[in-house]
Structures are given as C-alpha cells and as structure tokens.
Amino acid sequence: MPLIPVVILLAVGLFFIAARSGGTHQPTPGLMAEATLESPSGDRLGTVTFRQTATGVLIMAEMEGLSPGGHALIVHEVGSCTPDFNAAGDHFNPEDAEHGFIHPAWKRGEGTRGHGGDLPNIYAASDGSARADFFTVGFTLDQGPRHSIFDADGSAIIVHEKPDAYGEEESDTGNRVACGIIRPA
C-alpha cells in the first residue's frame, strides 16, 4: 500500500479516537472544586473536594451521619439539590456510555468505562463516618470540554443509600441520602 493512503487512514482514525475521548483538551492542573453534602432535612453531612491534575481529578471525601456500610457516590448531571435530590438528574454521562465499571462491552475494549460520574463506592464505619480518596478520568474541572462538570447547568454529587454493583444494569442504589452542588473553589 502506498505511504500517502496509509498516512491518511491513520490521520482519520486518530481524529475519530480524539473526538470520542473528548478531543485534545489538556487539563489545567491545580483547579479546585468543592461540594458540601447535606441530608434531605438540611443537616451538613460532609465535604467532597476535587483537585484537577494533569491526568485526571483527585477526589477527597469526608462524611458523617451515614448508615454503616456501602454507599454509591455518583456525580449527577445537574447542579441542583432539592429536598428529595431528584432535580440532580441522572448520572453524569457526557459520552453516552453504558453503565458500570465491569460492563462486558468495556471489558472487550468497546466504548468507555461506564458513566463519567460513576465513582467507587464509599463505606461508612459503625459510627456513620466515611473517608475516601480516589482518582477519576471520567470528567474535568475545566470549563468548556464536553466532559466538564461545569457545563451550563452544573453538576451535583449524590450519596446513595446502597452501594453500586458496578454491573451492566444500573443497580438499585436506593434513596439519595446526601447531595452537594459542586462549585469551583
């Protein structure tokens, strides 16, 4: 095969890969955001801090007043916390990906790793406290890219009553027990 068609084919392929992965966006290290978590009755339950790095977002969560055991922690698509937290909408999912860290399509190398807002479960101790630090590439704190949590209607972080099963189908994570609007810090 002549060299020019191969180069054109590679360029077109790289274009589609870049378009699917959010383009050529370079994150701005050092950007910060924070969400204060509140219960449906307005009690303060904790704080989630977000720090942009060159390769993703570091998330640091500290909570209290939760029921002991596992809880799904998920970024939702709208920055609104109404008394029942339903105004926060669905999971943040700018890539229109299938649900779950262990979705069969993702394990086959097809598509992206679940919803951008899907995070690891947190586990509350017997006294209701929970602390977790983890990293995600599912979203950015930069404004503008498609996978930014700071789009026109913002984003919220929700603590659910039960843990996420991480599977192909969205699991029954129960009621939304805490919500915080994510704001630039």
What feature does the model see in each segment?
Residues P2-L9, G13-G70, V75-A185:
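N-terminal leader/targeting pre-sequences
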